Amino acid sequence: VLTRPAVEAGERLGFLPGDLVQKIDPYLRPLYDALYELMGFEKVQKAFERSALEIAPLAFMRGRTLNNAFIILDEAQNTTPEQMKMFLTRIGFGAKAVITGDVSQIDLPKGQSSGLIEAERILKRVQGIAHVRFSSADVVRHPLIARIVDAYDAAGSAARRGQDRA
């Protein structure tokens, strides 16, 4: 099961036309793109046909129990604390969950806490939960991306040092 929150990056596009599938497709498109790249279009389609693969918006997870499933929550930095708790409490028997997110790319409204940051703080001592942090050395996209990440990290560090002096 693949899921992610429906949060836009910066600009708000407003209401989208069409039925439910057409409305949520733009938010889930990155998951489809990654699957097609990894498995190929035909294998992905066959996995959907066999119900071996499911992509669902995070908003539709409430009330579910995901037993014997491998669940990936992508872009978790854009969950609210309430959404994160709701997601974490969907994990059923025999299930494993992987939560990914980049806390330097939070697109939530100003003043809204990230569920990923809060979950890491709350769950850091809970047995059976591990946290892994990656750096620019782990970037698998174009080599330029690692340098971009480093430049933004350096600029952020410099800005924080400047705020500390104020």
Model-derived features with residue positions:
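Conserved helicase motor core of SF1/SF2 NTP-dependent helicases
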Residues: 1-73, 77-166
